Amino acid sequence: MKKTTLAMSALALSLGLALSPLSATAAETSSSAMTAQQMPSLAPMLEKVMPSVVSINVEGSTTVNTPRMPRNFQQFFGDDSPFCQDGSPFQNSPFCQGGGNGGNGGQQQKFMALGSGVIIDAAKGYVVTNNHVVDNASVIKVQLSDGRKFDAKVVGKDPRSDIALIQIQNPKNLTAIKLADSDALRVGDYTVAIGNPFGLGETVTSGIVSALGRSGLNVENYENFIQTDAAINRGNSGGALVNLNGELIGINTAILAPDGGNIGIGFAIPSNMVKNLTSQMVEYGQVKRGELGIMGTELNSELAKAMKVDAQRGAFVSQVMPNSSAAKAGIKAGDVITSLNGKPISSFAALRAQVGTMPVGSKISLGLLREGKAITVNLELQQSSQSQVDSSTIFSGIEGAEMSNKGQDKGVVVSSVKANSPAAQIGLKKGDVIIGANQQPVKNIAELRKILDSKPSVLALNIQRGDSSIYLLMQ
């Protein structure tokens, strides 16, 4: 107890000294000095940047799968059924809204959503955001930091990378952001995230670059994310990740959130990728990707040892498609791609993501390791006959997968499946080969599309999975 009293007395004494006239004069001098040199602050940079970050509100409708009722109950839920009349507890159930008799496999449901965006061209009103922010939108409203509101329309969308470009109608007095060279980023660089989390309005958080080239997250088909610990939450999608110069280094896209909240692991699409994709959208209204025409995997120490490759990182080529850009350049199965245009390639996913932003006709150079020798090949990207398509362009009920022709009329290969997508929910997996649909053989994407053009209420896919043949049913 005495020790406590003494400690408090000492504190009181020091406070008394601090309040003496002599100390007050010293404090005023110190305060003046601090004011003169100014405390470090992000405010001056943010004053220039925040007018280029916008809030986006959308309205639209989407197709949702409705449950299919057992056949012996369907007679009770027709249009004239007492179960579906006004006042019935079943009136608004899916079974009375087209699902009771099997419906058409889906039902239109209206939605409202919000997100963020970044102005990249003030004169033309171009705003970049995430595809998932404006997907299926019929109405898009953009609000600036000064409160002004504008209508906007979609210029182009790319579900594979989750980038979309919208255009503000009748733009006036806008401020565009400057894009940085995201290839120059280093782990440890400071980052600032700006967006509209939870619809609160413009919000700023800060952090650092935690990692670069993140892939394998099953968030998008082309993944080459910047990882940051700057807080990113729902509504931040499409917002800006900037450096301390106020330059755009990425578009905030996703978070790792096991419990739905921020835990300091957020992901942004690099600005160089954004620049390449949006320039194609401006020119073509879509992304026209060039392709190498190879299949491969990540190179790890075990694979390197088994294949007697003197490298630890790179993209291992397991197959080269006939008549592809890679085949014409002389790339062979067993090669390891170590660089693209002179810059190191760490993985197959990184190679795929970088090539995936390049348009048809792009000329590139690849550094290879072949039987222990380093060689360089030059090639021009072309539109491959093995070109992948988004499954939603074939049939809305299997949205969330990428597919390509297997070749030699042997079916359609599922090359990737997004987690929790409709495609994943019906059981499709990466590597599946669709060889039939609704009791009709499927040799290629064109045949699958033709079968599904009739929009069947029930879809039965015959899948070859490894050595097994299975059926997946969607209704």
Curated annotation (Swiss-Prot):
Molecular-function GO terms, alphabetical: identical protein binding; serine-type endopeptidase activity
Catalysis performed (reactions): Acts on substrates that are at least partially unfolded. The cleavage site P1 residue is normally between a pair of hydrophobic residues, such as Val-|-Val
Function summary: DegP acts as a chaperone at low temperatures but switches to a peptidase (heat shock protein) at higher temperatures. It degrades transiently denatured and unfolded proteins which accumulate in the periplasm following heat shock or other stress conditions. DegP is efficient with Val-Xaa and Ile-Xaa peptide bonds, suggesting a preference for beta-branched side chain amino acids. Only unfolded proteins devoid of disulfide bonds appear capable of being cleaved, thereby preventing non-specific proteolysis of folded proteins.
Descriptive protein name: Periplasmic serine endoprotease DegP
Location of the protein in the cell: Cell inner membrane
Catalytic-site annotation from UniProt: H132 (charge relay system), D162 (charge relay system), S237 (charge relay system)
Domain PDZ: 281-372, 378-467
GO biological process annotation, one example: response to oxidative stress
Additional remark text: DegP is indispensable for bacterial survival at temperatures above 42 degrees Celsius, however is also able to digest its natural substrates in a reducing environment at temperatures as low as 20 degrees Celsius.
Keyword Membrane: yes
Subunit description: DegP can reversibly switch between different oligomeric forms that represent inactive (6-mer) and active (12- and 24-mer) protease states. Substrate binding triggers the conversion of the resting DegP trimer and hexamer into catalytically active 12- and 24-mers. The conversion of 6-mer (DegP6) into 12-mer (DegP12) or 24-mer (DegP24) is crucial in regulating protease activity.
Family according to the record: Belongs to the peptidase S1C family.
Pfam family, one: Trypsin_2
Primary site of residence: membrane
EC id: 3.4.21.107
PROSITE patterns linked to this entry: PDZ
Top-level EC class as recorded in UniProt: hydrolase
Superkingdom, taxonomy of origin: Bacteria
